[in-house]
From Swiss-Prot:
Task performed by this protein: Ligand for members of the frizzled family of seven transmembrane receptors. Functions in the canonical Wnt/beta-catenin signaling pathway. Required for normal embryonic kidney development, and for normal development of the urogenital tract, including uterus and part of the oviduct and the upper vagina in females, and epididymis and vas deferens in males. Activates a signaling cascade in the metanephric mesenchyme that induces tubulogenesis. Acts upstream of WNT4 in the signaling pathways that mediate development of kidney tubules and the Muellerian ducts.
Protein name: Protein Wnt-9b
Organism: Homo sapiens (Human)
Subunit structure: Forms a soluble 1:1 complex with AFM; this prevents oligomerization and is required for prolonged biological activity. The complex with AFM may represent the physiological form in body fluids. Component of the Wnt-Fzd-LRP5-LRP6 signaling complex that contains a WNT protein, a FZD protein and LRP5 or LRP6. Interacts directly in the complex with LRP6. Interacts with PKD1 (via extracellular domain).
GO cellular component: a single term: extracellular region
Glycosites: N99
Localization per record: Secreted, Extracellular space, Extracellular matrix; Secreted
Length: 357
């Protein structure tokens, strides 16, 4: 059954980015982490030939590489975004059968699983977050602090701290993130939708922070700035979206003459189906179990688990081995006069549980 045209469009107007935008970068790119020899995360942005060389080292599309070469400081930001997305993905899925292992990632990207949806969302979210922070930190040449507070009673507020520039970040992403496909097939639209979910999750975490100034804390003047929430909070939001992801198919919007995402009604539901909401992660195929090694994951054999919380599910019914090990930790700590804490080293026995093969 075809949905009404207006219904099929619900929730698809997102952040004014192109409908076909998709995150072919980070965990959804050809290569996740490209090391820059001799460059630490706190290094100053490279200039000139060094910047161009760093752009060439990244596995980007031709258009993305051109944008990178025109933006001094962008190469380091892209690298940091890839790291951030990977670390957050692995943290959020550390107790799951699929733990965001790089092994099998390319196989996942060829399918429409829930895990694929999360990779697109966390990659676009990490890039949005990192780019906004890079602007406020002065690491990008073409952008600076957010300078459009949009608050009431501006006369009473003095903007003095450099805010995270989410406006520039989302505008830049509209050019940087592009689809390898057209927007005519279901997979392309699903990738675009999940990319937007990641961007929207970052945007929802933007907060206005103020500090009062004045005699006796009268707050006659306030210094305010816009600040993104920690990326861990964004990761938690996206993990919740993953847990409640919506399976979709396609339907033709007769008014616009194009395919739209469509979530069929669940069995026993009184509704005929709806378009997914703008914050829903969407997928097209049921995921494999991830229990055994496959082209999608290395399986769960040898994974450390919690006997009370995760061994039953993580080990897929194969059981688990128990090993004892000695762990050193600081104990009997005392504050010594003035300036330091003195501790003893203690050792305790710890049981470690690992999934059987």
């Amino acid at each position: 059954m075809r949905p009404p045209p207006a219904l099929a469009l619900a929730g698809l107007c997102l952040l004014a980015l192109p409908a076909a935008a998709a995150s072919y970068f980070g965990l959804t790119g050809r290569e996740v982490l490209t090391p820059f020899p001799g460059l630490g995360t706190a290094a100053a942005p490279a200039q000139g030939g060094a910047h161009l060389k760093q752009c060439d080292l990244l596995k980007l599309s031709r258009r993305q590489k051109q944008l990178c070469r025109r933006e001094p400081g962008l190469a380091e930001t892209l690298r940091d975004a890839a790291h951030l997305g990977l670390l957050e993905c692995q943290f959020q899925f550390r107790h799951e059968r699929w733990n965001c292992s790089l092994e099998g990632r390319m196989g996942l990207l060829k399918r429409g699983f829930k895990e694929t949806a999360f990779l697109y969302a966390v990659s676009s979210a990490a890039l949005t977050h990192t780019l906004a922070r890079a602007c406020s930190a002065g690491r990008m040449e073409r952008c600076t602090c957010d300078d459009s507070p949009g608050l009431e009673s501006r006369q009473a507020w003095q903007w003095g701290v450099c805010g995270d520039n989410l406006k520039y970040s989302t505008k830049f992403l509209s050019n940087f993130l592009g689809s390898k496909r057209g927007n005519k097939d279901l997979r392309a639209r699903a990738d675009a939708h999940n990319t937007h979910v990641g961007i929207k999750a970052v945007k929802s975490g933007l907060r206005t922070t103020c500090k009062c100034h004045g005699v006796s804390g009268s707050c006659a003047v306030r210094t305010c700035w816009k600040q993104l929430s920690p990326f861990r909070e964004t990761g938690q939001v996206l993990k919740l979206r993953y847990d409640s992801a919506v399976k979709v198919s396609s339907a033709t919007n007769e008014a616009l003459g194009r395919l739209e995402l469509w979530a069929p009604a669940r069995q026993g539901s009184l509704t005929k189906g709806l378009a997914p909401r703008s914050g829903d992660l969407v997928y097209m195929e049921d995921s494999p179990s991830f229990c055994r090694p496959s082209k999608y994951s290395p399986g769960t054999a040898g994974r450390v688990c919690s006997r009370e919380a995760s061994c039953s599910s993580l080990c897929c019914g194969r059981g688990y081995d128990t090993q004892s090990r000695l762990v050193a930790f600081s104990c009997h700590c005392q504050v010594q006069w003035c300036c330091y804490v003195e501790c003893q080293q203690c050792v305790q026995e710890e049981l470690v549980y690992t999934c059987k093969h």
